[in-house]
Amino acid sequence: MAAPTTSPTEIEKQIEENIAKSLAEIPHPALPQGTNIYGSTKIFPDYQAEAGETYFTLVHGIAHESSVSFVAILQATRALRKGFESAIYFYGPGAINCVATRGFPTTGDSGFPGEQNINQALATFIKEGGKVFACRFGLALHGAREEDLIEGIIPAHPLDVQDALIHYARKGAIINSTYQL
């Protein structure tokens, strides 16, 4: 094997020069903070609920594995604020979104920014009048207990998933079903 032709010091110097060159290629910040980079025209009307309308959300998504569960909660909250009767049903692995025991190093702490977003969003949804159901079997699959649930979340029998869907469909609910593998 041939001996290196450049010393570690020369390599480090070349790396530093390349970093400086890379940083200088595009001016930063490219746009000042607050610059609009997207239009703001809303295409559809800002619909509000008509008397008796219902919005039902099914969530089968794992907390923090993607934004699926969090966005579903935000959508259900928006529907609630538009005047819809709004309910969320967490089933399967989605049930673990409902635990109050999330946190690191202690319950309620955020081990990373946003760790408590789901808990806080669910507490807000419940406080504003939304109903939240959590499948007991989904909880059991992940070692969560009913006493671990966020206050106000309603534990539900596994067979209630289908019957809740039938119930809300018969009420004419708009049904938002999310699913994550």
Question: Model-flagged regions — what are they?
Answer:
Residues 86-92, 132-136:
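Short internal beta-strands
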Residues 106-138:
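A glycine-rich helix N-cap at a beta->alpha junction
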Residues 68-84, 88:
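Histidine-anchored nucleotide/phosphate-binding helix
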